[in-house]
Amino acid sequence: GFPVVVDVDLGENQVPGALESVTDHSMTVKKSLELRNIKIKVTEIAIPVAFASAFEGEVIRRGDMQVEFSSHKAPTCELVETVSADEIEDHKITIVGKDLDELEQGQTFALATYIKVAGAKMQSDFEPVIERKIHAWYNYMEGVMHTGQRNQIRVRVSKDAYEKGLRLKDFAEVLYVMIMDEFDIVVDKCEIEIVTDTEKVQEILETKAMPAYAARDERLETLTDESVDKFYTCTLCQSFAPSHCCVVTPERLGLCGAVSWLDAKATKELNPEGPCQPISKE
């Protein structure tokens, strides 16, 4: 049958998934959609610059940049973390620290892209797959250049994009829309935090990002080339190296150093026609 949502507090008389209370009327529609597992897809991203794969590979020279975020001079990281649905608020965007219009032009700063996701079908193996896509999605924005992965990244924003009104909330909006579009099979809710405060970035890096990276690497160490029956191709970097293709095995990462065999396997599961395809060892 159909779930029922009422605006009176039923307390312990609620039946999860069938009869639930929502006393805040502003949350009634959201709860109703959630109970019926109905997801709304955004067809146009409301940002002040163009957004398309045609901009992937755009190079922004130092003389043309408004600001830069780089691990060479400041702490940086990108992390996707799976949490329970009641721990996050869908489409919540938080900017911690100074925005682009408050940062000194031409200088380098810290940056953390911290994404929390929740979903009944979400697995920890899918986290690095979503992280890898941050590279492409940032590059899809006109006037934005992104290179690297994990805690070794560089992001440049052009003066032209800044003057058009591009701000960090637009970065977060792009991430939210693309995650809910490309990973809607496994992600039901998504919350995004963009951090430029150096101390906060360092805290996220040390307490959350590095332990997560280490746990993934440790799991991979138990696998060998002989213990699996297939390898995977990876063409994620073709935005910058159009003719390049890596062969990823348990003992050999992609040349970028960020795509492991488990990442490639999860990418294939999430996107069967995507950049990672199996290669039989036979």
Predicted regions and their residues:
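Cysteine-centered metal-binding/redox modules
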Residues: 1-282
